[in-house]
Amino acid sequence: MDKTDLQVFIDEHHIQATILPLSEHTLTVGDAARALAVNTDQIIKSLVFHVDGKPLLVINNGLARADRRKLADHLGVGRKKVKFASPDTVFALTGFIVGSMPPFGHKQKLRTLVDTAVTQLDVIYGGGGDVDAMMRLTPDELLKVSQAEVVPFSE
């Protein structure tokens, strides 16, 4: 899948989001912030974990790290049950490669958690479906589309 597929998803679901084509690759938060001339906190990361064998999408912002202990506590499992999914697994579940993955529009709908810090911003930027695209939207729109739980899980 790519930014064209993401745009179709946005259009079909009447989502208030804009895909921004860029002239450079944005594989990291720093790359994306520089390309968009925004603060790193406005860049959201969509990370796939396996929790007790089930996929979970976790969205946090900037350079913040997801605290596996906090995730485990929220989910009622031991910390060792919360593991990062491999890039191949991420692609199989979402249809997008790591570094381009949007927070929604995946091949498979995933249970989603959004860190509370993401909801405190006016505008956020997530993966746009390709390494040379980002998507602009509001936290409210993200929560509406993803049906995410808001949880404080960043370190």
Language-model features, listed with the residues they occupy:
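Extended, low-hydrophobicity, polar/charged segments
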Residues: M1-E155
